[in-house]
């Protein structure tokens, strides 16, 4: 394994069955940034008991775009759970956006929510409260400890499948069924 495992930006992390942290059990995490300082991602398969309509009302942003009111808000991770993050396609230009690549961005500024509420743009969004973060070397160590599987991200899984199907779909990209994974793992 290389010093940085390879850059995992725009990859999925699939929690292994031995994951001890309850925040990540059976989670699928999209990595928006990974570099020598650490990593930042959002869990994309954990809807919480809140809809976009409720969130928009809570932050006093009108939600006029059709079809969005009933969409769930997600638990994005255990860091800054009082703050919203929007994974969206296309990346666009917003006040506070981490541009992952030409196709996708992660934004934490209010202007994107105002645009979503008024026009439904950008057309593909996943809104979370909180994010997942790792310090320098932490994610690499967790991967070495067999806490995670990694696979290049497929945004069709995030934006095109119901949350309960996303983990299995990501695992199918690796040719693996979650039920066949062991809770103990080793290195050959």
Swiss-Prot record:
- Which Gene3D superfamilies does the protein's record reference? VC0467-like (3.40.1740.10)
Q: InterPro entries from the xrefs?
A: AlgH-like
GO CC terms in record = cytosol
A Pfam cross-reference name: DUF179
**Entry superkingdom:** Bacteria
- Which HAMAP family does the record match to this protein? UPF0301
Report the sequence similarity comment from the record: Belongs to the UPF0301 (AlgH) family.
Q: Which PANTHER family match?
A: UNCHARACTERIZED PROTEIN YQGE (PTHR30327), UPF0301 PROTEIN YQGE (PTHR30327:SF1)
Recorded protein name is UPF0301 protein AZOSEA09490
| Species of provenance | Aromatoleum aromaticum (strain DSM 19018 / LMG 30748 / EbN1)
């Amino acid at each position: 394994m290389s010093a940085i495992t390879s850059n995992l930006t725009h990859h999925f992390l699939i929690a292994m069955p031995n994951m001890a942290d309850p925040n990540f059990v059976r989670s699928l995490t999209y990595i928006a940034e990974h570099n020598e300082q650490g990593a930042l991602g959002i869990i994309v398969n954990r809807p919480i008991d809140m809809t976009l309509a409720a969130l928009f009302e809570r932050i006093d942003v009108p939600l006029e775009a059709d079809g969005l009111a009933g969409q769930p808000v997600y638990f994005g991770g255990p860091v800054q759970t009082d703050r919203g993050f929007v994974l969206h396609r296309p990346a666009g230009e917003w006040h506070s956006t981490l541009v992952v690549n030409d196709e996708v961005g992660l934004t934490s500024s209010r202007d994107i929510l105002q645009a979503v509420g008024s026009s439904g743009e950008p057309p593909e969004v996943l809104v979370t409260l909180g994010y997942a973060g790792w310090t320098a070397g932490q994610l690499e160590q967790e991967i070495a400890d067999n806490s995670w599987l990694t696979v290049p991200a497929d945004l069709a899984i995030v934006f095109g499948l119901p949350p309960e199907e996303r983990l299995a779909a990501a695992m199918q990209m690796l040719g693996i069924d979650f039920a066949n994974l062991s809770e103990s793992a080793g290195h050959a």
